[in-house]
């Protein structure tokens, strides 16, 4: 049983935007903590700052935890490894595999872009609703199943595309 592994590194653009957003988030954390220290416990200002702080922490943790690390392909399954959890796609459910060139203009239904990559539920007219796990938009692959569409990025995308097409036939 052969297992192929394809890493999923950041593009330079996504890495730069992630660093910039983390610096801005750090500023938001510090401003909220300063606001909580300066306001009376239990006041509206205290709870507003606490809510903003909690929302910022949630966004950072959520974006970090769902980012793609690598993709593996074995004889029966394509697996998208995230920081926490895996997405398993049985090869016998795959109906079509193709490349994708652009994600920047797609509608985010419940997704994050440019912060650790592009993740979540997206929509465009060609694909409809799809789940995105993308760190590098130059290396995107689309996998269609009977009930869901996945878009992800990995190194050696064309090699993975060829392997998937061979196993589908």
What feature does the model see in each segment?
Residues 41-59:
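Loop-to-helix transition at the N-terminal end of transmembrane alpha-helices
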Residues 57-98:
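Conserved beta-hairpin
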Residues 34-36, 51-55, 68-71, 116-117, ...:
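Short amphipathic alpha-helical segments, especially helix-boundary/capping motifs
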Residues 1-45, 142, 146-149:
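N-terminal membrane-targeting/pre-transmembrane regions
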Residues 2-5, 81-146:
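Non-transmembrane, membrane-adjacent beta-strand/coil modules in membrane-associated proteins
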Residues 14, 97-103, 158-167:
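Short, surface-exposed linear segments at secondary-structure transitions and domain or protein termini
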Residues 137-165:
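Terminal membrane-proximal soluble interaction domains of membrane-associated proteins
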